[in-house]
Amino acid sequence: MIVSTLEHILTHISLSIVSILITIELRIFLDDEIKKLYDSSERGMLITFLCITGLLANNWIYLGHFPLSDLSESLIFLSWSFALIHSIGYFTKNLKFLSTITSQSTLFTQGFATSGILTKIQKSSILIPALKSEWLIMHVSLMILGYAALLCGSLLSVALMVITVRNDGKFFFKSNNFLFREISYQNKNFFYAINYYKTQLIKELDFWSYQVISLGFIFLTIGILSGAVWANEAWGSYWSWDPKETWAFITWIVFAIYLHTRININLQSTNSAIVASLGFIIIWICYFGVNLVGLGLHSYGSFPSTSN
């Protein structure tokens, strides 16, 4: 009873704080002068991170195993991963765009994980035999940490593409009229300042997208390898082309291509951002879409069947 009440309190506190922080983050993103508001937002996100950490610890004690055995539990861990990335970014300057992404990602995943949609698959304290292994924590946690980092990096790439497309647009209407030419001349410095700011923002988005995706790719690679070892112990085969395994491999290939485009100077920035944006969709198919189908060896984490 106490454990259940504590879980309820921690869940709603974390969800409420993040909901408030989203409004603050969006306001801060548009105004560089709100220092106190920014500090309050960061402290609030740290509190959210601690609440979700407490929620995971509470569930671990209640269930008797680390809470990563179904979709609901993995979503909570995913929201914790977003909050962790946000907390790391707190100690790095000029990362407000990353904070905006991670705070909203935390809200959506935490909100969905604790919603009534997943009620039927929550609180299953009995593990299937394949999950009763020390590999559970290592494999699943690394995969979800990898997904979280790759999703954040991909969203930075999406933002980069949007800004790049708008930056390439024409700010002036071509006209031979003297009045329009005069206005264009007077506002030239203003538009140069805007373009300079956008150029610097694009460079920062490109740099941090690459850094975050590289980190996520490392987690994903180790997660897949550890999963292969675990699969051999549990099912007698390192790889069985299970739907989840197949899409995890596709995800790995997509982001391997992304890293290749980063090595090739001619394919950097916009081209690599396109690949990362595609990867954003692929990750959700791998993580969430396969669970909707509920087929294969990983179907224990899927939605429950509605038919009896």
UniProtKB/Swiss-Prot annotation:
This is Cytochrome c biogenesis protein CcsA. The keyword Magnesium does not apply. The chain crosses the membrane at residues 2-22, 44-64, 71-91, 143-163, 212-232, 247-267, 273-293. It comes from Cuscuta reflexa (Southern Asian dodder). Keywords: Cytochrome c-type biogenesis, Membrane, Plastid, Transmembrane, Transmembrane helix. Belongs to the CcmF/CycK/Ccl1/NrfE/CcsA family. It holds the Pfam family Cytochrom_C_asm. GO terms for molecular function: heme binding. NCBIfam families: cytochr_II_ccsB (TIGR03144). It is found in: Plastid membrane. PANTHER family: CYTOCHROME B_B6 PROTEIN-RELATED, HEME EXPORTER PROTEIN C. One of its GO terms (cellular component) is plasma membrane. It is a multi-pass membrane protein. GO terms for biological process: cytochrome complex assembly. Its main location: plastid. May interact with Ccs1. Required during biogenesis of c-type cytochromes (cytochrome c6 and cytochrome f) at the step of heme attachment.
